[in-house]
């Protein structure tokens, strides 16, 4: 028997998530599907797909069709649940309490000004978009057999306008 790690959701620990989250995660759990498998069927990146599950990304009409197919959810129900606009940024308390999410916050806390300085030197005065943005997570194993998480952020550079 293979060891499959699947992300699940205890909705009682996440009261700020939309109703769609419970429906999506239940179907994901029932079908024993990883975000990688679901994303492959939907035709999106696995982080973008997971963001839909957490109510942090907007699902397109095609995403809804494909999610309904792969998860076995009624299309009409899913279209109703995912038809609105995401209410981003409310899903976790701040600062985050989950250790992994806190470490991501800690990375920005510790290296944020260094990132900013290097980006300003490379691009000038501006910001990296989180709207024209993509991200991915990869697993890398070094020569000693240690696993490493490789997280890539790719955001369009937006220079500040002079006015």
UniProtKB/Swiss-Prot annotation:
Which chemical reaction does it catalyze?
cyanate + hydrogencarbonate + 3 H(+) = NH4(+) + 2 CO2
Sorted alphabetically, the keyword list is: Lyase
Alphabetized SUPFAM superfamilies for the sequence:
Cyanase C-terminal domain, lambda repressor-like DNA-binding domains
Q: What EC number(s) does the entry state?
A: 4.2.1.104
**SMART domains, A to Z:** Cyanate_lyase
Q: Name any one Pfam family assigned in the record.
A: Cyanate_lyase
Q: Which GO terms describe its molecular function?
A: cyanate hydratase activity; DNA binding
Report the active site residues: 103, 106, 129
Query: What's any GO biological process attached to this entry?
Result: cyanate metabolic process
Enzyme class name: lyase
Whether Transferase counts among this entry's keywords is no
Which PANTHER family does this UniProt record tie to the protein? CYANATE HYDRATASE
Instruction: Describe the function of this protein.
Output: Catalyzes the reaction of cyanate with bicarbonate to produce ammonia and carbon dioxide.
User: Could you say which protein family the record assigns here?
Assistant: Belongs to the cyanase family.
Q: What is this protein called?
A: Cyanate hydratase
Q: Which gene encodes it?
A: CYN1
